[in-house]
């Protein structure tokens, strides 16, 4: 909510779902469609490290790459305060990993590739 309010002026517009690994956040408002997992424990699923922020979907109607980089900068600044250490993508058909400079962490069946990088190594 802090990012959405500061950057776009939206307040209380995200849906939060708790699960065994952490939380999932979904935002469908205005010019954005986001789905992000905040996993405290991955249990090896997708080869994600524990304490990962996983961008599943990040679609902005305008300035896609710049808004994605801005979101990554926000995570790099604030997420470590809450224990998160990695930024990852899931089944990255949209090529977010290229925009953010993430590295391949898992090559699954049917070209389902996951990418990730420690937040401290992220250069955005």
Go through the PLM ranges and name each one.
Residues 1-63, 73-124:
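Non-catalytic substrate-recognition and accessory regions of acyl/acetyltransferase enzymes
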């Amino acid at each position: 909510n802090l990012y959405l309010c500061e950057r776009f002026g939206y307040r209380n517009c995200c849906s939060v779902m708790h699960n065994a690994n952490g939380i999932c956040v979904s935002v469908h408002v205005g010019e954005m469609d986001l789905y992000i997992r905040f996993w405290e424990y991955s249990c090896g699923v997708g080869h994600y490290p524990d304490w990962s922020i996983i961008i599943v979907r990040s679609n902005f109607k305008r300035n896609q790459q710049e808004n994605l980089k801005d979101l990554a900068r926000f995570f790099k600044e604030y997420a470590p305060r809450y224990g998160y250490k990695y930024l990852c993508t899931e089944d990255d058909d949209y090529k977010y990993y290229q925009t953010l400079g993430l590295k391949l962490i898992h090559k699954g069946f049917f070209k389902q590739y996951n990418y990730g990088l420690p937040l401290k190594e992220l250069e955005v």
